[in-house]
From Swiss-Prot:
<feature type="active site" description="Proton acceptor">
    <location>
        <position position="93"/>
    </location>
</feature>
<feature type="binding site">
    <location>
        <position position="251"/>
    </location>
    <ligand>
        <name>substrate</name>
    </ligand>
</feature>
<feature type="active site" description="Proton donor">
    <location>
        <position position="255"/>
    </location>
</feature>
<feature type="binding site">
    <location>
        <begin position="94"/>
        <end position="95"/>
    </location>
    <ligand>
        <name>substrate</name>
    </ligand>
</feature>
<dbReference type="InterPro" id="IPR008794">
    <property type="entry name" value="Pro_racemase_fam"/>
</dbReference>
<dbReference type="Pfam" id="PF05544">
    <property type="entry name" value="Pro_racemase"/>
</dbReference>
<dbReference type="GO" id="GO:0047580">
    <property type="term" value="F:4-hydroxyproline epimerase activity"/>
</dbReference>
<comment type="similarity">
    <text>Belongs to the proline racemase family.</text>
</comment>
<dbReference type="GO" id="GO:0050346">
    <property type="term" value="F:trans-L-3-hydroxyproline dehydratase activity"/>
</dbReference>
<feature type="binding site">
    <location>
        <position position="85"/>
    </location>
    <ligand>
        <name>substrate</name>
    </ligand>
</feature>
<protein>
    <recommendedName>
        <fullName>4-hydroxyproline 2-epimerase</fullName>
        <ecNumber>5.1.1.8</ecNumber>
    </recommendedName>
</protein>
<comment type="function">
    <text>Catalyzes the epimerization of trans-4-hydroxy-L-proline (t4LHyp) to cis-4-hydroxy-D-proline (c4DHyp). May be involved in a degradation pathway of t4LHyp. Can also catalyze the epimerization of trans-3-hydroxy-L-proline (t3LHyp) to cis-3-hydroxy-D-proline (c3DHyp) in vitro. Displays no proline racemase activity.</text>
</comment>
<keyword id="KW-0413">Isomerase</keyword>
<feature type="binding site">
    <location>
        <begin position="256"/>
        <end position="257"/>
    </location>
    <ligand>
        <name>substrate</name>
    </ligand>
</feature>
């Protein structure tokens, strides 16, 4: 076989959201820091080529992420990783952190200790502490101490043709989110509304990014609203969430970074205090436990330290390869499954 590139992927999902983990064949990524490596993947043609190799057809699909496992830059970390999605490489993700932790332990790359194993993960957004509950060689659950999360703006407003004036919060939880109370759109978060929520989320994200500029004060490589997360409250008090993602799909998990950003807004409004915890449910009913571990500051701004607890499950392992003579090897997309956003991808 005439393969010029080959990588091994462990198939993992966290509460329904796919987060494949590249455990072998990952090339060296240039950069002195993980943030530098993130920047390279998003700006260098070779970085874009690597991302397209993994996330576009014929090897990829619009759903899920691929996590590149990398050597840690920080001596305190056990491993580093960067999240690859069709739109770009991303700095941080709660569900993907749980997938990576599960992969590291269940593959034996990091020795599993029972009943508890601590894994330090390095992301472009900072260190994430993962505490895995382990039993009989299985990773039962993972609790993440997320990066400090903060509010950029509460009750921002944007005028829309479809829904009139929409209020939203801008907050950071590892990436920037626009957090929208879903009932403003006349919708509820349930599986039957997934397509309508996606269409609304993608429209709002585009309009917000055109009008508002957000940049992390300490990490310039993290800028712009990455996702719109719709939120609601279930009758039992659980937070119901739906994060909308490029090219036009919903997060199957409750979303760790989105809940971290939302936690910052809840604290800013006086609705939670250190030591509090609550359930967050996704559009398919899967759950995270969200906790407020403590308070801190980021560049002089008040910030919260969130915890997220969820489960990861391995479901397969496979290899992907590139035939040097394959005319479609660089990847391709079509609007039938990728939607109109397919036309914006530069192959």
């Amino acid at each position: 076989m005439r393969w010029k590139r080959m990588m091994q992927l462990l198939d993992v999902h966290c509460e329904g959201e796919i987060g494949k983990v590249a455990i072998g064949g990952v090339p060296k990524i240039p950069g002195d820091t993980v943030a530098d490596q993130l920047h390279w993947l998003n700006t260098d043609p070779k970085g874009r080529e690597l991302r397209h190799f993994l996330v576009l057809e014929p090897r990829g699909a619009p759903i899920g992420s691929v996590n590149l496992l990398l050597p840690a830059k920080d001596s305190r970390a056990d491993a580093a990783f960067i999240i690859l999605q069709p739109d770009q490489a991303h700095a941080s993700s709660g569900s993907n952190s749980i997938c990576v932790t599960t992969a590291l332990l269940e593959s034996g790359m990091i020795e599993m200790q029972e009943p508890e194993t601590v894994v330090m993960l390095e992301t472009a957004a900072g260190l994430v502490k993962a505490v895995a509950q382990c039993r009989d060689g299985h990773c039962d659950s993972v609790t993440l101490t997320m990066v400090p999360s903060f509010v950029h703006e509460l009750d921002a407003q944007i005028a829309t043709e479809s829904w009139g004036e929409i209020r939203f919060d801008l907050a950071y939880g590892g990436v920037f989110y626009a957090l929208v109370d879903v009932r403003q759109l006349g919708l509820t978060i349930e599986p039957g509304n997934a397509r309508r929520l996606v269409e609304a989320g993608m429209l709002l994200k585009g309009e917000i990014n055109q009008r508002i500029q957000v940049v992390h004060p300490d990490i310039p490589a993290i800028s712009g609203v990455a996702y719109v997360m719709f939120r609601d409250e279930d009758p039992d008090g659980a937070v119901r969430t739906c994060t909308t993602m490029w090219p036009g799909r919903v997060d199957r998990s409750p979303c760790g970074t989105g809940n971290s950003a939302n936690l910052a807004t809840l604290h800013a409004r006086g609705r939670v205090k250190p030591g509090d915890s609550f359930l967050s449910r996704s559009i398919i009913g899967s759950q995270f436990t969200v906790g407020l571990q403590g308070l801190t500051t980021v560049a002089g701004r008040s910030a919260v330290i969130p915890t997220i607890t969820g489960r990861g499950f391995t479901y397969g392992i496979h290899q992907v390869a590139l035939d040097a003579f394959d005319p479609l090897g660089g990847g391709f997309v079509l609007t039938d499954v990728w939607g109109a956003a397919a036309e914006t991808i530069k192959i």
